[in-house]
Amino acid sequence: MKIPARLKPNSRHREEVVVGSDGTYIIYTKAPAIEGRANAAAIKLLAKYFGVPQSRVKLVRGARAKHKVFLIDI
């Protein structure tokens, strides 16, 4: 299934996934948006949230943007 998400890198919050009022997943991560570190952290958090291995979570759109689309193979 495709998951629309908004990534919040360098977050002071704890690392977590929250569902927004519009159905978009908001991903808070402490990783910086440098060299794909925030994207890797987002994949790890989404895998934990949905209870699937990290290999089943793929970034489909938005590799260099805050608004992203992930594909999760459940």
Language model: regions and residue ranges:
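Contiguous, often N-terminal, cationic amphipathic patches that form binding interfaces
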Residues: 1-36, 40-43, 52-54, 58-64, ...
